[in-house]
Amino acid sequence: MNSNEDIHEERIEVPRTPHQTQPEKDSDRIALRDEISVPEGDEKAYSDEKVEMATTNASSNFGSNESAKDGESIGAFSNPHEALMQSKLREESQSKTILPSDDLSQQLETEESKVEEALKRITSPPLPPRADCIEESASALKSSLPPVLAGNKNDQAPLDRPQLPPRQVVNAETLHLKAPHGNATPSKSPTSAVGNSSSSTPPTLPPRRIEDPLDLAAQKHFLASTFKRNMLFYKSEDNSIKCDLDKNILNLKEDSKKINNNEIPEEVSSFWLKVIGDYQNILINDIETLHFQLSRGIPAAYRLVVWQLVSYAKSKSFDPIYETYLTEMAPFDVQEFENQLKMMDEVPSEYVKRISNVLKAYLLFDPECEFSTDIAYIINMILDVCEEEANAFGLLVRLMKVYGLRLLFLPSASEIDILCYKFDRLVEEFYPEIHNHMVEKGVRSSMFLPGFFTTLFQKKLPTEIQPRIGDMVFLEGIDSIMRILATLLSNSRDHLLKMGFDDMLELLKSGLLDAYIKQNDGTRGDTLLSNECMDKLLQDSMMKVAITPKTMKKYSSEYEEIHRLDNEKEVQYKSITEKNLHLQKHVRKLENDYTSLNREHVTIANELVKNRLNIESVLNENNGYKLQILDLKKKLDSEKKKQVLGVYVPNDLKKDLEETMKKNTQVMDENLKLQDRISELERLIEEIKTANKNGTLFEYSNSKNNPLGAGWSGFKKVFK
């Protein structure tokens, strides 16, 4: 059930409209409500509303004495309606006695139902939007109310009337008026005039995201970021390699306990033993101490163990690889390289062959990496720490592959440009005067900076200090070297600001260390003072130059964003160049094809000319033949005409031919008979001759009994 205060709140909200300052219109509204039929149970609610309307109209007069009395209490509220409501509730609470809990609950229920019924029947002008009102509830309430009755035109508010401030919800908890505790039944949640209910249940918060302490440390310290990168490399390896690395790490931890640390202070020795025992825990809980101890250098007795532990460089797999590459042919002139090493003051003579072996093995291991004498300085630093060449090879592989140093020795060497940009931004942020002077004189970091990174600053530092650079690189990464250069620039600030292009470039290339030693009361000839100056330089660079991995990452993102368009243009240019080369090859091919086709065309054209000439000759010959044929046809026609005119052919030629053929047949038969007779007579003549010769008498015998003259009679008939 609602409390008594909620009832007063609902009653006050009903007449609170922009027309409260017009008594005539309020009276019209009261009269209009009186005309509406009201149930008997709601008469009290309407009478209370009339009283409240009159009270509101009276309070709207600014010159009333009552408002002057309550000026202080009303002034405490930013909204005058809230002040009026507060004063009215305070008066009613003083005049009324507190009812028992059961009676109070019943009365509250009754009053709430009356107020709800009255609100349904009351027609009021639209109120200004409330700050805590929900749009859906307001639209629902507006649709449920009856239409507003038209009033008198003279009652309309003037156009220059100020708007009232937004209404605020005032509930029992705000006024500190609560129902008495006891056996009272639980009351309903208070309902506002627009129908939205207040809820005491707070919204459920999303689960809190707990950041990894190592990730948080990796944003602020190079120590943690480098360890995190090495951990990612470790997790990416095969299980067999992981087992080998884990086994060797345990061996390193056991070997570290056997190291003779008598010459090392106990505090320093115990700290580095803790680092070796649980490096990740030190990074999370005591990274500042680790950074401080690193600025003073890792003790020489623990240096190799720490390097191999942090970089995961202790692996048995490097031994057979190194031995295999030693037997192969080097990708460079070994003799010439060794002669160059002998000329270097920083390289001891006993390291020449060992440096050559390690460099040969690595270049065979990583063929993409180009040969450079600067790598010899890095190998020399590693050999100062470890005696075995295989261990030096493993450290060099990790330094190149995992720490990204190989990117400086690739043919493109794009990483150098990124490092130069990072250094420029670092100088611009920490030493803007030096940066502006360098830009003004045209000196760019790419003119002097690459040599420091490719040699890891080994070319300029004394031999005793060189392993300290290895401490920084293996534990913090390559970006940590920028601290040294930034410290040297800061130390030579006054000299740099007075120099021109040539002098400044010469100082930046080779004179920064000399200037630092000279300024700190040391000389190159005094080795002790020089080492002390270099030690101070490293400490100052690590403790005073505050750069973070987050800053370096921001610089890298800036570089990528700046050069993104350039890279896109370069990629586009390369693609266009490749396409152009392809098109040029295609053009050459087309030209060759065109040349061959042109030759074929010339040959075919020549043949065509010859064929045309032959065709002309054939056509001429053909025309001659045609003329000859025409002449022959004419002659033939003339001959035919002559034969037709000169010869008479009778009509019964066929019959004559048949008769002639028959006669010819008969003649032929007779001819055959005569031929036979001639043959017989010739035979007879021969017999007669033979008989005469023999002197015998010839006797003629005719077997056919034909007279000798019978045949001649037939012959005569033929020729009749």
Swiss-Prot record:
The modification N-acetylmethionine is found at residue 1. Belongs to the GYP5 family. InterPro entries: Rab-GAP-TBC_dom, Rab-GAP_TBC_sf, Rab_GAP_TBC_domain. PROSITE patterns: TBC_RABGAP (PS50086). Interacts with GYP5 and RVS167. Is part of SEC4-containing complexes. This is Probable GTPase-activating protein GYL1. GO terms for biological process: endoplasmic reticulum to Golgi vesicle-mediated transport; exocytosis; protein transport; regulation of exocytosis.
